[in-house]
């Protein structure tokens, strides 16, 4: 049935006409040609025929399938930042599909041998050929015996572990939206294992009853979704006799079988004792940790008498079976709030860098009496595990008015809930590969963004775009909804289509090294470090590789070292040289570097190189980590840099800078984060002069006009 027929019927009432019945479809009246505006056709088609509308049952089977596909791909495209990201994910998903084995290869060998022995072009049947028994009889050969065909190795299962807290407090509409999102995630190739968290209000019997009821309720909501099936388990966890206080997974096969069959698995936090079977309630967080340990392949108890190499191989084989890619915490509290600094929430948390700082911040809000009266800044150690440097990220405390409101507006239970989510995310990601990530958001946020096209505005109507689904967006992009390096003014909720409550994207992350350590020596023109890029603390070959890989150009290392050595302000290195920044102090042309106060005052903080490895670009938050360290810790009073006018990264720079200026008669655009720079004419001219005068240090001419 064509969309024109649907649109015409929805646009205006029609008189009865003879009906035309097609195979597999219902009977529909054949309408006369009638015309309506394109706007009316679009709106009514979306409203009258959606998977949740009353008219949905009137559609034929093929029409229903097309409509469901349309809703699925519309949700897919709206959840990605760009169509390129959605296309990229679909390409990765297609690449994961194994090639079909050639089952008929062996059976065709005999037929091919017979055919080759016969005269070409003539089918003489079996009369002139040898009998089948001759071809199939054993033959003595000195050739090596072909190895038997190896059974197909099961495809690696990509999995998301989801915890839903207090689903009994969610209405049916919200739960249906969550189930719709889980169904879409499952369709995108990420199997879902859901753990029900009934909370802690009530005795053991009451909580067990609530958990059992909610498992069935969630299963019903999942089964209502098109092409979606659920399975639920009540006995997958157990308490071993040796460790009666720590739950473990009793059967790995029982856990993985429904997931491999494409079912959404729902687990109740109930464990059974091994010695005398008895059902006991388990804290949902402990259940999540037990499942994570099993799915990560770390639950195997090594035999002391077994060869360590054999034990390692067993663990490796288990890890090849399953890839736990996401740990999703759906909590009515939403993401992790921020009580210090200008931001109100954490869009992205780099656990290696920020966990202890955020945990301490939440504890200070929970117990304000324990805070020191004279505290005015919060110290954020950039990398406790890095031997080269540790940085103190100093952010101003919140305003007195904000501090006064915190104890009244935020209760201890709320802070405890956020602490539990933060710690659970840290503990689970610590057991998983660095590529895995976590999401902390609210069920309401997921349900609202998963609404059907029925409630969506017309594509032609005036308004903001549909709200992105945080779970699908993260699956497609491996990035948070809002970049953590965006200025606060560009992260504020200006419309109803930004997340509220916030969503927090969590990665195990990477350490960040700042050289020199700003906590020991602040980066100022008066305290320039006496260091060069060939300093022992700097791995120069890896730094050069980072720059060349990021810019896709060969660096003239000797010329570059001659230019920046003696001018260095410092270096920012993320992880194992996955990203970094080189910052210098530059003097405008004509100003003599004589060490005087007037000369030092004219020095410009300049971002000379900002680089991220290609494999880390666009995902993982490496660029955000480096940029945040630069503007919040190293140069909080401002820094400038330049970029080619046609650089595709300029959009990213525009969003994060406080201003930009196209340099006339050049191919450069100048950016800065210095507050009120246009109101300071001398400093502005110095910034412009520096950006104009610096000469590139590339080894060959690639045709790029600098």
Curated annotation (Swiss-Prot):
Family: Belongs to the acetyltransferase family.
Record-level GO BP terms: L-arginine biosynthetic process; ornithine biosynthetic process
Region annotated Disordered, chain positions: 1-25, 367-403
Gene that encodes it: arg2
Transit peptide, UniProt annotation: 1-35
Localisation per UniProt entry: Mitochondrion
Stored Pfam families: NAT
Name of the top EC class for this enzyme: transferase
Function: N-acetylglutamate synthase involved in arginine biosynthesis.
Keyword terms of this UniProt record: Acyltransferase, Amino-acid biosynthesis, Mitochondrion, Transferase, Transit peptide
Major localization class: mitochondrion
Pathway, per record: Amino-acid biosynthesis; L-arginine biosynthesis; N(2)-acetyl-L-ornithine from L-glutamate: step 1/4
Assigned EC number: 2.3.1.1
Domain of life of the source: Eukaryota
A GO CC annotation given for this chain: mitochondrial matrix
Keyword Nucleus: no
Compositional bias annotation for Low complexity: 389-401
Protein name: Amino-acid acetyltransferase, mitochondrial
Compositionally biased spans, kind Polar residues: 367-388
Molecular function terms from GO: L-glutamate N-acetyltransferase activity
Organism the protein comes from: Emericella nidulans (strain FGSC A4 / ATCC 38163 / CBS 112.46 / NRRL 194 / M139) (Aspergillus nidulans)
Domain N-acetyltransferase: 527-696
Reactions that this protein is recorded to catalyse: L-glutamate + acetyl-CoA = N-acetyl-L-glutamate + CoA + H(+)
């Amino acid at each position: 049935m064509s969309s024109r027929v649907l649109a015409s019927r929805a646009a205006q009432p029609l008189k009865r006409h003879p009906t035309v019945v097609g195979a597999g479809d219902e009977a529909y009246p054949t309408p006369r040609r009638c015309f309506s505006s394109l706007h009316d056709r679009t709106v009514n088609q979306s409203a009258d025929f959606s998977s949740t509308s009353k008219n949905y049952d009137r559609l034929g089977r093929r029409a229903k399938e097309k409509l469901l596909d349309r809703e699925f791909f519309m949700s897919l495209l709206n959840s990605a930042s760009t169509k390129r990201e959605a296309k990229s994910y679909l390409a990765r998903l297609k690449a994961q599909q194994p090639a079909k084995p050639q089952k008929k290869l062996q059976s065709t060998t005999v037929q091919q041998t017979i055919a080759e022995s016969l005269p070409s072009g003539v089918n003489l049947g079996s009369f002139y050929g040898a009998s089948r028994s001759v071809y199939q009889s054993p033959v003595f050969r000195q050739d090596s015996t072909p190895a038997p065909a190896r059974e197909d190795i099961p495809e690696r299962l990509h999995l998301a572990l989801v915890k839903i807290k207090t689903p009994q407090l969610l209405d049916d509409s919200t739960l249906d939206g969550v189930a719709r999102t889980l169904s879409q995630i499952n369709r995108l190739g990420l199997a879902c294992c859901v753990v029900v968290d009934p909370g802690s209000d009530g005795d053991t019997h009451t909580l067990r009853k609530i958990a059992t009821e909610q498992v069935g309720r969630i299963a019903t909501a999942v089964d209502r979704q098109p092409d979606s099936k659920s399975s639920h388990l009540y006995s997958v966890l157990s308490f071993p006799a040796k460790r009666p206080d720590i739950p473990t997974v009793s059967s790995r096969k029982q856990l993985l079988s429904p997931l491999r069959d494409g079912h959404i698995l729902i687990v109740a936090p109930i464990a059974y004792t091994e010695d005398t079977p008895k059902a006991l309630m388990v804290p949902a967080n402990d259940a999540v940790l037990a499942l994570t340990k099993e799915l990560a392949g770390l639950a195997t108890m090594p035999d002391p008498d077994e060869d360590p190499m054999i034990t390692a191989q067993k663990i490796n084989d288990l890890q090849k079976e399953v890839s736990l890619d996401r740990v999703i915490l759906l909590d009515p509290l939403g993401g992790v709030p921020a009580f210090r600094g200008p931001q109100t929430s954490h869009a992205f948390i780099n656990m290696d860098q920020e966990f202890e700082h955020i945990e301490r911040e939440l504890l200070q809000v929970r117990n304000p009496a324990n805070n020191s009266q004279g505290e005015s800044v919060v110290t954020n150690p950039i990398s406790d595990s890095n031997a080269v440097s540790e940085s103190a990220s100093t952010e101003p405390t919140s305003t007195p008015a904000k501090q006064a409101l915190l104890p009244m507006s935020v209760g201890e239970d709320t802070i405890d809930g956020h602490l539990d989510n933060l710690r659970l995310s840290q503990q689970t990601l610590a057991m998983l590969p660095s590529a895995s990530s976590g999401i902390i958001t609210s069920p309401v946020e997921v349900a609202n963004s998963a609404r059907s096209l029925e409630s969506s505005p017309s594509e032609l109507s005036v308004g903001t775009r549909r709200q992105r689904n945080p779970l699908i967006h993260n699956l497609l992009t491996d990035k948070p909804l809002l970049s953590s390096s965006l200025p606060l003014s560009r992260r504020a909720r200006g419309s109803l289509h930004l997340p509220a409550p916030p969503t927090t994207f969590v990665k195990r992350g990477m350490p960040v090294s700042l050289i020199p350590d700003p906590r020991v020596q602040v980066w100022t023109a008066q305290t320039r470090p006496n260091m060069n890029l060939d300093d022992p603390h700097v791995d120069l070959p890896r730094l050069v590789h980072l720059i060349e890989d990021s810019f896709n150009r060969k660096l003239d290392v000797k010329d570059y070292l001659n230019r920046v050595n003696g001018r260095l302000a410092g270096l920012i290195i993320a992880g194992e040289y996955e990203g970094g920044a080189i910052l210098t102090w530059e003097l405008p042309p004509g100003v003599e570097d004589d060490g005087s106060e007037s000369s030092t005052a004219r020095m410009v903080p300049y971002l000379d190189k900002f680089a991220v490895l290609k494999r880390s670009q666009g995902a993982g938050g490496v660029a955000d980590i480096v940029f945040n360290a630069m503007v919040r810790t190293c140069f909080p009073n401002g820094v400038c840099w330049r970029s080619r006018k046609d650089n595709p990264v300029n959009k990213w720079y525009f969003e994060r800078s406080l201003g930009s200026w196209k340099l006339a008669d050049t191919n450069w655009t100048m950016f800065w984060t210095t507050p009120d720079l246009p109101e300071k004419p001398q400093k502005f001219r110095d910034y412009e002069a520096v950006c104009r005068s610096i000469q590139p240090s590339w080894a060959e001419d690639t045709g790029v006009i600098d």
